[in-house]
């Protein structure tokens, strides 16, 4: 009973979601909460299930496009669930779901622990990175994840890396039937601190130089159709700078879409579909979005 009372004290209604996403777009959450503990997440999850509400999880709000119409049910923002514990004896790091990935990468580098240098520019949290199998600079979460703690309808469970069925920017967690609350990462301690810091700094500068950080965006919009690069195909179609409303294909990196001020989620989706159609017509390549669509859209063919 105490958990339910506590939830009712923190639960909010009709909360604008644009400020919680890196695109800075999106409508209202029917219900919204920011649980600060695993127990609070479990209570909120159970409440939503009993009410037959869908549950949506947010972290940094990157890699997401939330509809202008908002989201029904309960939105749980896990950004308050932070922290990381480094075990020098084993090289294992226990990380909470809301821990920002760049902060984690810098923390590892400062201790001379290798394995997260690639992640320094990832605009998200640990939970989102685990779900999406985030990656960059030749590394990804699947390389270092050992296990993950999730909340399901059955309660708190521990899943192995094999159970996640990792693939390129994919895991079974994307079905939304489980909520990541923490994960164990296997890193490599004992390196020269200066060496790891140098590699991390180099990766960060490379991302700052080649990717747009000056305007709201979600990170890479499309998966790379290996061995080709989505950005190169989009650029070859002459789409850099192409704009629908205030949504624009970045002139710095064509696999990024920018909110130039007052873009709507629908503008961004329309631009995504235009890019897909143009690349398909020119190269016969079907670009698959890396960004996840949440809510109802008026789709554009």
Curated annotation (Swiss-Prot):
EC number: 1.3.1.98
One GO-annotated biological process of the protein: cell wall organization
UniProt pathway: Cell wall biogenesis; peptidoglycan biosynthesis
Record field: catalytic activity: UDP-N-acetyl-alpha-D-muramate + NADP(+) = UDP-N-acetyl-3-O-(1-carboxyvinyl)-alpha-D-glucosamine + NADPH + H(+)
Annotated coiled-coil segments of the chain: none
GO annotations of cellular component type: cytosol
Location within or outside the cell: Cytoplasm
Cofactor(s), names only, from the UniProt record: FAD
GO molecular function, one term: FAD binding
Active-site residues, Swiss-Prot/TrEMBL: 169, 220 (proton donor), 290
Domain FAD-binding PCMH-type: 24-190
Top-tier EC class: oxidoreductase
The entry's keywords: Cell cycle, Cell division, Cell shape, Cell wall biogenesis/degradation, Cytoplasm, FAD, Flavoprotein, NADP, Oxidoreductase, Peptidoglycan synthesis
Keyword Cell division on entry: yes
Family to which this protein belongs: Belongs to the MurB family.
Role summary: Cell wall formation.
HAMAP family per the UniProt record, alphabetical: MurB
Name assigned to this protein: UDP-N-acetylenolpyruvoylglucosamine reductase
């Amino acid at each position: 009973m105490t958990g339910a009372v506590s939830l009712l004290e923190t639960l909010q209604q009709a909360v604008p979601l644009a400020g919680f996403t890196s695109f800075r777009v999106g409508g209202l959450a029917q219900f919204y909460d920011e649980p600060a503990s695993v127990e609070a997440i479990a209570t909120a999850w159970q409440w939503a299930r009993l009410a037959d509400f869908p549950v949506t999880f947010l972290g940094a709000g990157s890699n997401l496009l939330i509809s202008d119409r908002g989201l029904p049910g309960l939105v749980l923002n896990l950004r308050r669930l932070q922290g990381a514990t480094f075990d020098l004896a084993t090289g294992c790091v226990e990380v909470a779901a809301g821990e920002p990935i760049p902060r984690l990468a810098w923390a590892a580098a400062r201790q001379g622990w290798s394995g997260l240098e690639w992640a320094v520019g990832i605009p998200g949290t640990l939970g989102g990175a685990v779900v999406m199998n985030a990656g960059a600079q030749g590394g990804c979460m699947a390389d270092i994840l050992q296990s993950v703690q999730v909340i399901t309808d059955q309660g708190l469970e521990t899943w192995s890396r094999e159970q996640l069925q990792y693939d390129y920017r994919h895991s079974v967690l994307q079905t939304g039937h489980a909520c990541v609350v923490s994960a164990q990462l296997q890193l490599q301690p004992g390196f020269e601190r200066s060496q790891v810091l140098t590699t991390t700094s180099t990766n960060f500068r490379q991302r700052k130089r080649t990717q747009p950080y000056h305007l709201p965006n979600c990170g890479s919009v499309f998966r790379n159709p290996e061995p080709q690069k989505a950005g190169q195909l989009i650029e070859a179609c002459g789409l850099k700078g192409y704009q629908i409303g205030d949504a624009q294909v970045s002139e710095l990196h064509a696999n990024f879409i920018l909110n130039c001020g007052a873009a709507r989620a629908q503008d961004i989706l329309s631009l995504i579909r235009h890019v897909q159609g143009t690349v398909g017509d020119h190269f016969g390549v079907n670009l698959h979005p890396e960004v996840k669509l949440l809510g109802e859209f008026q789709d554009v063919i």
